[in-house]
Amino acid sequence: MAQKEIVSNRKALRNYEVIETLEAGIVLTGTEIKSLRDHGGNLGDAYVIVSKGEGWLLNASIAPYRFGNIYNHEERRKRKLLLHRYELRKLEGKIAQKGMTLIPLGMFLSRGYVKVRLGCCRGKKAYDKRRTIIEREKEREVAAAMKRRHH
């Protein structure tokens, strides 16, 4: 079954070097699901913590559902992630390393359920960001040259 990307965290890909990725389920209310289907989510400042054997998504913004009434949800509440115990232990070990953090890279629909794509990341320094930009420009120039050559 195809996965439909709902929300992506482009800021994370710019500011962090992704070492490893994994998928996790997330506990949401009905109005949060409906809002996400309307692309009402933002993962810009979001991060994940592991405490007491549970994974939590913090600072993820899911806009209030526009047709939700008094039962609407809080926009930046703490949301529980659904992970197996061995996955949580593995993540705790990764986060314990210096400079490592867990960042949500995106949210997608899989068989009607919202899943979160998590990345075990290390922060990029300014010179790493510049190097990435230079490499991307070189790749673009090579692709353009190849395209001109074949036409």
Curated annotation (Swiss-Prot):
Protein's GO biological process: trans-translation
Coiled coil: none
Domain of life: Bacteria
RNA-binding is among the record's keywords: yes
GO function terms (MF aspect): RNA binding
Keywords on record: Cytoplasm, RNA-binding
Chief place where the protein resides: cytoplasm
InterPro entries: SmpB (IPR023620), SsrA-bd_prot (IPR000037), SsrA-bd_prot_CS (IPR020081)
Pfam families, A to Z: SmpB
Gene3D superfamilies: 2.40.280.10
Gene Ontology CC annotations of this record: cytosol
Keyword Cytoplasm: yes
Subcellular location: Cytoplasm
Protein role: Required for rescue of stalled ribosomes mediated by trans-translation. Binds to transfer-messenger RNA (tmRNA), required for stable association of tmRNA with ribosomes. tmRNA and SmpB together mimic tRNA shape, replacing the anticodon stem-loop with SmpB. tmRNA is encoded by the ssrA gene; the 2 termini fold to resemble tRNA(Ala) and it encodes a 'tag peptide', a short internal open reading frame. During trans-translation Ala-aminoacylated tmRNA acts like a tRNA, entering the A-site of stalled ribosomes, displacing the stalled mRNA.
Family: Belongs to the SmpB family.
The protein's name: SsrA-binding protein
Source organism of this protein record: Chlamydia pneumoniae (Chlamydophila pneumoniae)
